[in-house]
């Protein structure tokens, strides 16, 4: 059953963010489709600093745009979690120079701005 707030929401934002923000790789489907090897894809972890990740600025922008909710990928098909997970060591917290829980920062900033928070967590995991 759809919640009333969602039915009435006019604008929502969906953020695909991950280690593929480093280079010229278009999201995690690149290695699945054979455009890049899994090993080369995962090398992006070495350069993932999240230095331009600013959840508060995003929240301000989304609020100004009139968004009522925001959904972010917490873990996409590549298996790289954007949060500190006890399930695997494959996270931006443990495997990248960023060493930050981006989901925690995102969630806090969106809620502080009065935006509803959603998370996309892929059950598909090509890292297994």
Predicted regions and their residues:
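Mature catalytic domains of secreted/periplasmic carbohydrate-active enzymes
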Residues: 1-128
């Amino acid at each position: 059953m759809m919640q009333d707030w969602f039915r009435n929401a006019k604008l929502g934002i969906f953020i695909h963010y991950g280690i593929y923000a480093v280079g010229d790789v278009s999201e995690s489907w690149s290695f699945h489709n054979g455009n890049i090897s899994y090993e080369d894809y995962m090398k992006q972890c070495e350069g993932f600093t999240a230095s331009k990740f600013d959840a508060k600025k995003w929240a301000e922008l989304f609020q100004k745009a009139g968004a009522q909710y925001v959904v972010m990928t917490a873990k996409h098909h590549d298996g790289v979690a954007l949060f500190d997970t006890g399930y695997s060591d494959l996270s931006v917290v443990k495997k990248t120079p960023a060493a930050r829980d981006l989901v925690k920062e995102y969630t806090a900033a969106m809620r502080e701005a009065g935006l509803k928070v959603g998370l996309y967590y892929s059950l598909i995991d090509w890292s297994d």
